[in-house]
Amino acid sequence: MAYKMHTKSFILHSDFSPSGDQPQAITQLIEGLENGLAHQTLLGVTGSGKTFTIANVIAKLNRPAMVLAPNKTLAAQLYAEMKAFFPENAVEYFVSYYDYYQPEAYVPSSDTFIEKDASINDQIEQMRLSATKSFLERRDTIVVASVSAIYGLGDPDSYLKMMLHLQTGAIINQRQILAQLAELQYTRNDQAFERGTFRVRGEIIDIFPAESDDKAIRIELFDDEIERLSLFDPLTGSSFGPVPRYTIYPKTHYVTPRERILNAIEKIKQELAERRQFLLENNKLLEEQRITQRTQFDIEMMNELGYCSGIENYSRYLSGRNEGEPPPTLFDYMPSDALLIIDESHVTVPQIGGMYRGDRSRKETLVEYGFRLPSALDNRPLRFEEFERLAPQTIYVSATPGPYELEKSGGEIIDQVVRPTGLLDPEIEIRPVAIQVDDLLSEARQRADQNERVLVTTLTKKMAEDLTDYLDEHGIRVRYLHSDIDTVERVEIIRDLRLGEFDVLVGINLLREGLDIPEVSLVAILDADKEGFLRSERSLIQTIGRAARNLKGKAILYADRITNSMQKAITETNRRREKQMKYNEARGIVPQALNKKVGELLDIGQGANQKAKANRNAKKVAEPTALYVVPQTAKEYQQQIKKLEQQMYKYAQDLEFEKAAAVRDQLQQLREHFFEVQ
């Protein structure tokens, strides 16, 4: 059956029109893409509106796009921004759906085999399915993804073949529909109607599609004919009205037609026989017994159920690819004329290059010791050269582009240095190392008195801890951000810094791309003259840029000599600052402070459920007002505390970090009130 794609145009919603360097950057990027340039680099400084520029390019070219981000946090931030720019179009989110993931591994030195263990986030799985569905169905699609996009996914050809097409008036009996749903790995559940399940009541079949979070489809049969199709709310049961046709997508990306599974089983048996012979010839009897037992169990499971635990290790056969060929990934679902935007490319590009090697070494050990067949090596992320081959026209976006991006762009970069707000890059001062701690203490006090914040970056964990203790002893409200802090707590700490719970944040690597704190007026870089990864040109520019969102932004570099990296970072920052000042003077622009609300970060999945958003309480999470009803007795207090704790952990588990932080604040207030009453 030919597949028809919806051709709706992108409609950009914004209260602002492009300004500063944005109009010029948009024009240059569009011209480059229309002239067939495969690679372009956008050098956009912090706060210059890079996302808005990219949104304008996508809207004007009207082409589907994938935006790659280096981590889940930044991907979520970009998803929220793109969702706001394109509320009428398909903006999707595609990141790893594991809350916890322990890959299968073997440690020969201790003869320890570690079974694969994983916890899948149901909401993110739904968003991944929604992302591939949008790429297959709609032209007006933007998928914001992490490097999870280069990992193996189900074969799109098999995925498309397995779809169940429903149409009013079609002749199909109930038994056929139920059999096809079972093939799509949907399960029947007449009690709990959840995502990926269906229920049957007489001649009515209700299906809750795996990629949907708020709409289910009802099939009403009259004998062997589909009499009516209608969408309804699975929670309330209220109808959204009839639809002429509907397509049910498989419950998972890894679903495979029965004939291909049977074909794969024969090839697996053949490989197993060859592997057994090899192991026996090399006197590896234990390994031979192990691989035989494990593989035969998998074959039986696939024969009976159509899948098995770890079925992805047989992806070479299931996708019909030859040895060494790249696995199917999200790139195989993209339309051929899609755009690829790599955000924070100086971090993301090296990440893409590093994924394959780590995965390969772990799997080679499993193969060598008889836990997996050699074909399991083809269940892998893309190699870098394969990624390059598959990537469509690409725009690299970074404040500090790396050598790879510059080489691919032929050394030509598109500058976006002037901010729409007129804000300038921070002033840079160099002060001697000998006075760095006491000088920092003095600067921190001045900033705290003016209700401003300070970021301090050190070289070692010990130095960061000692500095935090020293500042604390001298009355500075200070916190220390270190590598042991998880994502939820990190979001909470940054939120508390913005709210003024403390004034100084100390860390080792605070250049984290996308760390958006307009209240920070001072960045202090200790031991700036120690060459290395944390004091490279890019690291220094990124760290200095953390103060670029404040009217009084300043960076102090404590150093006894000016290193090559320092000189380059200072020269580049001064170049940008000079260009910004000239632009402002020529147009009479007065720099304006950013008033970004603390609550405007992200709620992963909020965009996916507009109804929930509309019904949500209007209060922002940044507001310290408690939303609970004040209990009257000790028992009521304990019940309320327990209830809020459960709610907080649920939000954290769903990656809704800001909601979790808001509930944490409520808990703290409730506990304080309880102790006062006691």
UniProtKB/Swiss-Prot annotation:
Record's keyword annotation contains Transmembrane: no
PROSITE patterns to which the protein is assigned, alphabetical: HELICASE_ATP_BIND_1, HELICASE_CTER, UVR
Chain span(s) of sequence motif Beta-hairpin: 97-120
Primary location recorded for the protein, binned into one broad class: cytoplasm
Cross-referenced Pfam families: Helicase_C, ResIII, UVR, UvrB, UvrB_inter
One GO term describing the cellular component: cytoplasm
Keywords on record: ATP-binding, Cytoplasm, DNA damage, DNA excision, DNA repair, Excision nuclease, Nucleotide-binding, SOS response
One of the protein's GO biological processes: SOS response
Positions that bind ATP: G44, V45, T46, G47, S48, G49, K50, T51
Domain Helicase ATP-binding: 31-417
Record's subcellular location: Cytoplasm
Nucleotidyltransferase is among the record's keywords: no
Record domain Helicase C-terminal: where: 436-589
Family: Belongs to the UvrB family.
Xref: PANTHER family: UVRABC SYSTEM PROTEIN B
Function: The UvrABC repair system catalyzes the recognition and processing of DNA lesions. A damage recognition complex composed of 2 UvrA and 2 UvrB subunits scans DNA for abnormalities. Upon binding of the UvrA(2)B(2) complex to a putative damaged site, the DNA wraps around one UvrB monomer. DNA wrap is dependent on ATP binding by UvrB and probably causes local melting of the DNA helix, facilitating insertion of UvrB beta-hairpin between the DNA strands. Then UvrB probes one DNA strand for the presence of a lesion.
Subunit annotation: Forms a heterotetramer with UvrA during the search for lesions. Interacts with UvrC in an incision complex.
Domain notes: The beta-hairpin motif is involved in DNA binding.
UniProt name for this protein: UvrABC system protein B
Gene responsible for this protein: uvrB
